[in-house]
Amino acid sequence: HGDDRRQRQMCIRDRNDHGHPVYGTHHAEDAAGLFKTMNLDLDLFSSAMKVNSQYMHTVWFNLKLKEPTSKQKVIDLLSSNDRVSLTEHHSTNEVFSFGRDQGLYGRILNQTVIVEDSINVRNDHEVSGFCFTPQDGNSILSSIAATVRFLNPHSYQDKINSLGGFFFDRV
């Protein structure tokens, strides 16, 4: 948000790789590449750890912001983004099960599911917490968005917004 310049994350996933000297894992390198398309040069670094779970990635995030904030402001901002879902669940099993029962063809299409009570604001400028990345639904939405943008560069956002009914405010 704005000119914020530093972010840290830890991704716990089904395999590990930590080979990039500047970014750590490919996650931060990929994110840095994305932000560079918006002329933002951010200090990004990520680590990953291998766990025996096929459900979804668990990501710890830590953001240092220029402007002061509060936990409620962070929750309000996250709630206003339809690609972000909030949850009270602490287990990937519960979130994954919700997606299988309630999601479009058993998928959660939101880009991330933030564990609401894990959000912490320290010294008014540092936000941390945990989120889950719904792997299959996340990549399905990204693939749809890339294809629609290629085919309809001037109206793709309207077409993607038509999927809004399949995003969850809460899981």
Listing of model-derived features with the role each one plays in the protein:
Residues 36, 40-48:
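A structural supersecondary motif
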Residues 5, 56-58, 124-125:
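A general secondary-structure signal for short beta-strands and their flanking turns/coil
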Residues 62-171:
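C-terminal active-site/capping subdomain that shapes the small-molecule cofactor and substrate pocket
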Residues 17-21, 51, 133-136:
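Hydrophobic alpha-helical scaffolding
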Residues 13-35:
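Mid-domain beta-loop-alpha active-site segment that forms a flexible
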Residues 21-25, 29, 55-56, 68, ...:
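Electropositive phosphate-/nucleotide-binding environments in soluble metabolic enzymes
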Residues 50, 56-63:
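Glycine-rich phosphate/diphosphate-binding loops and the adjacent beta-loop-alpha structural elements
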Residues 1-12:
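Single conserved hydrophobic/aromatic residue that forms the stacking wall/gate
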